[in-house]
Amino acid sequence: MIVQNVSASGVAVLNATDPNVATMASKCKGSVTFFALDRHHPIMATHLAQGHAAVYVEDGHLVAAQGKFKYYISLSQVPITLGGAISFQVENVMASVAAAWALKVDWATIEAGLASFSNDSDNAAGRFNMFKHRGATVIADYGHNPDAMSALVQAVEALPATRRSVVISGAGDRRDQDIRQQTEILGRAFDEVVMFEDQCQRGRKDGEVIALLREGLKGAPRTKESCEIYGEFIAIDKAMDKLKDGELCLILVDQVEEAMAHIAAKVAAG
């Protein structure tokens, strides 16, 4: 375990809200910096009360705190979080801040670094990259598991949209229940689901992944439209060509570089 190998003078940065991660603190020879969105989480509250370091969110700011020391960074100055609207990106940023703080990086440098974090594809391709297309919001992400779907849905629900659509395939090397669960989650948040299958099935037979995705959509409380398509780019075109002003489309890309280039070309073409 990585945490067990932290030296006595080192620091482990741990997510206080994940029980499997938080318990690693007892194995750390060095000190621990916890992070969480809520400073009142029991582990965070205890850790802070004992004078240890932690990073949390308060009134639209990231707060790095230890004892009487507090340093505030406005989330409005961290583009990748969309002003704090994207929770999973806020958590990523908190972990980054905690790590830089542990390395004694000065705060001006940390803030400058955070200001350079953005959602564009040049910064981190396939990681919640956002585009504007015909007045609609298009988001491209490489999420391929239930946890990713839950995080993406939470982020999407924080964004305004008159209608939501999603383009998805499934990684054939995942368990059946994991593939099904992805569309179960998406079916609660999207009006339309475009399912696609492409050449790389990772050991699955043709049609097998689509069938599992279809099963996951059964009884979906929100999804009223769905379709099945062979070919990633054809699926992307179908979803993007239907978009109207004020709508939102989440595209769960498979061939990251190629798909990102395809989306960018469509956006440029208008």
Language-model features: where?
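ATP-dependent carboxylate-amine ligase
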Residues: 29, 86, 98-108, 112-270
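Acidic, Mg2+-coordinating active-site environments of NTP-dependent enzymes
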Residues: 1-137, 216-219
